[in-house]
């Protein structure tokens, strides 16, 4: 995922959500450069976040989403993780599919 994004943008985006409780997916996606990407590239980033390659991003993987962008990214709090999941999980199955992720990135 990192090779599709600019290091400066990643740093800026991570700095913006450094404080616990400050994570906002819309702001983060825009700052990190995801929003400007094609659907295809967004799906490549999804695959990088989907650590177990299940085809879904589960709540556990979502907690560590910032680490997919940089090793020093913090863990999301439980509240942030749940809010992120709720925003993305359109079909209510408790996890985020690749199309749900792409929709979430581009709807903001």
Swiss-Prot record:
Query: Under the cellular component aspect of Gene Ontology, which terms does the record hold?
Result: cytoplasm
Q: Name one Pfam family in it.
A: EF-hand_7
What are the UniProt keywords, alphabetically? Acetylation, Calcium, Metal-binding, Muscle protein, Repeat
**Sorted alphabetically, which PROSITE patterns does this protein's record hold?**
EF_HAND_1, EF_HAND_2
Q: Supply the InterPro entries for this chain.
A: EF-hand-dom_pair, EF_Hand_1_Ca_BS, EF_hand_dom, Parvalbumin
Binding locations of Ca(2+) 1: 50, 52, 54, 56, 58, 61
What region holds the EF-hand domain? 37-72, 76-108
What does the record give under GO molecular function? calcium ion binding
Q: So where does Ca(2+) 2 get bound?
A: 89, 91, 93, 95, 100
N-acetylalanine, modified sites: 1
Other notes on this protein?
This is the major component, having an isoelectric point of 5.0.
Instruction: Return the similarity comment.
Output: Belongs to the parvalbumin family.
Tell me the function of this protein: In muscle, parvalbumin is thought to be involved in relaxation after contraction. It binds two calcium ions.
State the protein's name.
Parvalbumin alpha
């Amino acid at each position: 995922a990192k090779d599709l994004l600019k290091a400066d943008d990643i740093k800026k985006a991570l700095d913006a959500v450094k404080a616990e409780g400050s994570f906002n997916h819309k702001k983060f996606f825009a700052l990190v450069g995801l929003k400007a990407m094609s659907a295809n590239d967004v799906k490549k980033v999804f695959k990088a976040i989907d650590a177990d390659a299940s085809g879904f991003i589960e709540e556990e993987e979502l907690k560590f989403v910032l680490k997919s962008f940089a090793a020093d990214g913090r863990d999301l709090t439980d509240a942030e993780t749940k809010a992120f999941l709720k925003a993305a999980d359109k079909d209510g199955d408790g996890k985020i599919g690749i199309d749900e992720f792409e929709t979430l990135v581009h709807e903001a």
